[in-house]
């Protein structure tokens, strides 16, 4: 599961569910609306809102918790209208995306931590970067085929510096 808020809007939250879908609340969690039916696979492990444009959301498929009955996802999805509509944004073989980071100054610069297939070695693991809002992706970090990226943090003083953990 994943959750994110919107700066300046204390009652607006988005929630990516382990059971599937992206949900939205405008009243601090009293009522939730599914805003993604028909767009995603079994689970959402990462969700983020752009600081430079809060209408831009990214959601990554696959649970971030590793256990025996984990469900995989099918890449990354993007909304440019606060969740009213969604478009596939790539990384179809990622299986598990535990973190998505958006450059605070440019919502087209996006980083995705990809854990990959939990049950076998794969070259899909690592950290990916898109400079065009998810149209094209480049792998910028690859530890090895057994260690996927599990978390990302962007330096708030210098968005060109990113910290990643692999496991």
Language model regions located:
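Beta-propeller blade termini and top-face loops
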Residues: 1-167
């Amino acid at each position: 599961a994943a959750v994110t808020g919107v700066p300046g809007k204390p009652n607006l939250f988005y929630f990516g569910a382990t059971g599937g879908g992206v949900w939205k609340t405008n009243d601090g969690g009293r009522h939730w609306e599914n805003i993604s039916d028909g767009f995603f696979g079994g689970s959402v492990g990462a969700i983020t809102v752009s600081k430079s444009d809060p209408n831009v959301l990214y959601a990554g498929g696959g649970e971030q918790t590793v256990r025996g009955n984990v469900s995989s996802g099918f890449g990354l999805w993007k909304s440019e209208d606060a969740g009213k509509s969604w478009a596939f944004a790539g990384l179809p073989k990622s299986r598990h995306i535990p973190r998505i980071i958006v450059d605070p100054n440019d919502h087209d610069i996006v980083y995705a931590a990809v854990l990959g297939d939990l049950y076998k070695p794969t070259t899909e693991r690592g950290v990916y970067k898109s400079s065009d809002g998810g149209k094209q992706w480049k792998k910028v970090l690859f530890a090895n085929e057994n260690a996927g990226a599990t978390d990302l943090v962007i330096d708030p003083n210098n968005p060109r510096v990113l910290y990643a953990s692999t496991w």
